Amino acid sequence: MEDKEGLIWYNGDLIDWKDAKLHVLTHGLHYASSVFEGERSYSGRIFKLHEHTERLFFSASELDFDIPFSIEEIKEACYLTLEKNNLVDAYIRPIAWRGAETVGVSAQSTKIHCAIAVWEWPSYFSPDDRLK
């Protein structure tokens, strides 16, 4: 998926998919100081978006970091990213992680990053089955 066309919401800005990069010494990579959600949109509506976003923020608080955006900003960014990628049936992956400012178990001084990627993911069910 590295060379996919599209946009990713990255720290508040929409950037080209291929430009969404992080440093190899990112704390989130070495110490698993990251949180994510997996969401689905059907016909342009994100299923249980508020609940997923609240859980993302709760998970971050359990790892003792604050996502530098509000719940509402993340929800809006999810829809914006879908819209700018012209997707309606899609998978949405919001993720937040500690940066590479320091490597070591304690990372209170690291910057918190946030991104939202989306990609096409058709429904598993036919239109008739979805009505059951």
Question: Where do the language-model regions lie?
Answer:
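Conserved alpha/beta cores of soluble small-molecule-handling proteins
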Residues: 1-132
